[in-house]
């Protein structure tokens, strides 16, 4: 994909918090031949003004309606959940939409966004940066050659994000209007009630399931959609979760996330095993820059000898590559590799994982 073969995309950024300051705005500035950022938006006036000044953005606003009235092609939504209303407004205003994960809480929200996207004819892309990592793409090619996958596991040991953010210049403001905070709480609660219906009260203690989003979209991209949630356990005061998934070929996947806040050592792996091959990805935290995802491949060659290899990984960021892919989708009509339609499957799986915990029984899909 040649950087200068397509027109520049004018994109507005909604949400000026940590992920915007650490990843999206620095990356958009580096991609100045491909993107222009004429406006940012945050409900915190101080946050919006600071980020606009720091990243040399000409204009800042506190109301997304003012942003959507501006001369922009697309919006990048990375503000605090929920993002559904903002996404729908953007589509209705004729803008392409990049929306950070998870895209929403309920299937009803996902369907509303997808409907607005289709009516607008615009691109809707989920912020699934891990599938754009060069190491992930290399791993996918290896996995596609595996005949009979037996076992899969993802392990996600998550320290406090504050440990990672301490190495970056991230500024926060406490001028958020109380009414905005109350509206967010009510909208989030309504979405959870929509997602879980009669199980809503019990689902209130299961929010960590949404923290599996990186693991789940990576699994879906690599292996497809599971046929069942066999079981789910949540423990340690809702800071740890393990769920077992079943795939159509009978393979099992064990997905675990544990919040271990104090020790600064982020661990996240995706491991795929068959009789003759093993593929293991090791990811860095999303709050890092210029840190590569690592790939290990083990197998048996044509001579019957075992091999172990760690391929050299190109120095490309998944965060940057997903933005370039968005531009390609906008300019050339390329189907998105992380479309809102695909992202809906991930929300459905999170809901089923939660239901398996609440009911203490399998959920067949």
For each predicted feature, which ranges?
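N-terminal Rossmann-like dinucleotide-binding module
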Residues: 2-55
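C-terminal helix-rich "cap/oligomerization" subdomain common to oxidoreductases
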Residues: 2-4, 74-76, 122, 248, ...
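Short active-site oxyanion
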Residues: 35-39, 73-75, 124, 206
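Beta-loop-alpha module in the N-terminal Rossmann-like domain of NAD(P)-dependent dehydrogenases
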Residues: 55-116
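A contiguous active-site-proximal alpha/beta segment in oxidoreductase catalytic domains
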Residues: 105-181
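Oxidoreductase and adenylate-handling cofactor-binding alpha/beta cores
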Residues: 132-153, 166-169, 192-202, 208-233, ...
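C-terminal glycine/acidic-rich active-site capping loop/insertion
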Residues: 171-175, 179-199, 271-338, 363
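Contiguous beta-strand/loop segments that form the cofactor/metal-binding neighborhood of enzyme cores
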Residues: 199-287, 316-334, 351, 364
């Amino acid at each position: 994909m040649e950087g200068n073969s397509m027109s520049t995309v004018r994109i507005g950024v909604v949400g000026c918090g940590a992920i915007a300051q650490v990843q999206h705005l620095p990356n958009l500035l580096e991609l100045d031949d491909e993107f222009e950022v004429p406006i940012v938006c945050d409900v915190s006036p101080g946050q919006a003004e600071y980020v606009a000044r720091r990243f040399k953005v000409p204009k800042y606003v506190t109301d997304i309606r003012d942003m959507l009235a501006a001369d922009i092609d697309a919006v990048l939504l990375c503000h605090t959940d929920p993002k559904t209303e903002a996404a729908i407004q953007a589509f209705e205003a004729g803008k392409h939409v990049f929306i950070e994960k998870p895209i929403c809480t309920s299937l009803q929200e996902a369907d509303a966004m997808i409907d607005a996207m289709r009516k607008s004819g615009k691109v809707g892309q989920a912020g699934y940066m891990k599938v754009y990592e060069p190491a992930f793409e290399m791993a996918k090619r290896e996995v596609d050659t595996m005949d009979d996958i037996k076992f899969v596991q993802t392990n996600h040991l998550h320290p406090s994000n504050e440990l990672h953010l301490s190495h970056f210049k991230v500024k926060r403001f406490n001028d958020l209007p109380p009414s905005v905070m109350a509206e967010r709480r009510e909208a989030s609660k309504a979405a959870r009630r929509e997602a879980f219906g009669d199980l809503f009260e019990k689902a209130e203690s299961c929010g960590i399931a949404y923290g599996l989003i990186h693991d789940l979209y990576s699994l879906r991209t690599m292996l497809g959609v599971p046929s069942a949630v066999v079981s789910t356990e949540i423990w340690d005061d809702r800071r740890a979760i393990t769920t077992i998934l079943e795939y159509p070929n009978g393979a099992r996947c064990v997905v675990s996330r544990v919040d271990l806040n104090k020790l600064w050592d982020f661990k996240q792996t995706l491991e795929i095993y068959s009789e003759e091959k093993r593929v293991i990805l090791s990811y860095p935290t999303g709050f890092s820059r210029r840190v590569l995802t690592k790939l290990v491949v083990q197998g048996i060659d044509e001579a019957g000898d075992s091999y172990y290899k760690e391929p050299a990984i190109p120095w490309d960021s998944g965060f940057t590559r997903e933005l370039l892919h968005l531009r390609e989708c906008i300019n050339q009509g390329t189907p998105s590799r992380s479309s809102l339609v695909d992202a809906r499957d991930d929300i459905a799986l999170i809901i089923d994982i939660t239901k398996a915990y609440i009911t203490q029984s399998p959920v067949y899909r």
